[in-house]
Amino acid sequence: MNGIKETDTVNAPLLLVISSASMDALKIEIKLWERAFEKEHGRLPEKDDIKKDKEVKRKYKQYAQLKKDATVKPSVEVNVEQTPVKSHVNNTKAEFGPTPQMNGKLVSIFEMQVSAMKTHQSDQEDIVGSPVRSNDLVRRQLNFSITPNSSPMKQVPNLSANIVVSRPKYGPNSPMRIGDIGLQLSETPKTLGRTLDLKSSPFSPSPLIKRPVKTLSQLAKEHAIIKDEFESNPEDFSEFTAIRTLMEKLMQEEHMDIIEEGDEGTVGNETESNYVRKVKTIKKRTKAKMRPAALNEKSTNIPDKNVHEQLAKLKEREYNKMLGKEVEESESDSEQQSNPPVKKKQRKSKYNLVSNNFKRLNLPTKAGRNRASKWRGRR
């Protein structure tokens, strides 16, 4: 049986080659017949035409059968019987020797230190080290001392021998606490060289974190000393400050009078100012008449007041304010405050005349254009 099946498997590719060649030949014959039929009748052949010719019908059937056999996969390999072959067994947990080492020396069973209770993972972990030395020797070599803040290749100077650690004397935000902070931090080898010289640090303390150096008692003493100086020497009070304050007050009064007059004048001149602005934006050809502003007479007039008396009064007021006394107003000041300046009121017009709404119409005539161009040129 085995011999017959093996011959079938050998002849299978030959049969496939023969069937494919015969199928190609049949296909060529069928195509030639179809072209001849199309030339003769002017159309492709149909099923009825194929059935009439028995030879052509046989070729069609044979071609269909060969095509079907070529598409179906041969099931020859399924019936092939194979004799069983003994597989190679790999026992990964085998610990018996003799085992060749990297240096070429053979280690027998009695020289190896094998424990029967170890698992496969522990065997892989014990491979580290030289094959000749035992595990006890390796453990002795690994018991060397390691400093936590240094590498085995670099020696680190002892900071505790040179610098004495003291208690923190300053607050948490004090710039004087930088030295104490540097002593308390544990440094790594990367930043160790930066903190070796703590005294010559390139950073300056921040001025924003400083607290007031003087206490409240010291500030109170200084205030009392300054107060005694003013009481003992009242003439030393600078007259320059009194003159400056007096002039500032006088200028403020004049400025307020000017503002009040300007508010009264703006009520009647709002339409004129708006009209002037409108002329500027639209760019009309009419010339806007800009009259000079009226000079304020009050600004040139000198106030009818005694400057020396006012200076003396201001000096007394400033001195009393420094001492914390209440300032008593004089009669002249109260009279000036009680009699404010009388404001002039504008009389309202009785009727709204139609002539107020009159506006000249500028027609773009030829003469007007010439005039406008001449006027623009003179300007």
UniProtKB/Swiss-Prot annotation:
Superkingdom is Eukaryota
Record-level GO BP terms: DNA replication initiation; double-strand break repair via break-induced replication; mitotic DNA replication preinitiation complex assembly
What's this protein's family per the entry? Belongs to the SLD2 family.
Residue ranges with Basic residues bias:
368-379
| Record protein name field | DNA replication regulator SLD2
| Region Disordered, residue ranges | 287-306, 324-379
Gene behind this chain?
Answer: SLD2
Compartments (UniProt record): Cytoplasm; Nucleus
What's this chain's function? Has a role in the initiation of DNA replication. Required at S-phase checkpoint.
**Which InterPro entries does the UniProt record give?**
DNA_rep_checkpnt_protein (IPR021110), Sld2 (IPR040203)
| GO MF term list | DNA replication origin binding; single-stranded DNA binding
Where is this protein chiefly located? cytoplasm
**Leader peptide range in chain numbering:** none
Species the sequence originates in: Kluyveromyces lactis (strain ATCC 8585 / CBS 2359 / DSM 70799 / NBRC 1267 / NRRL Y-1140 / WM37) (Yeast)
List the keywords (alphabetical).
Cell cycle, Cytoplasm, DNA replication, Nucleus
User: How is this protein annotated for GO cellular component?
Assistant: cytoplasm; DNA replication preinitiation complex
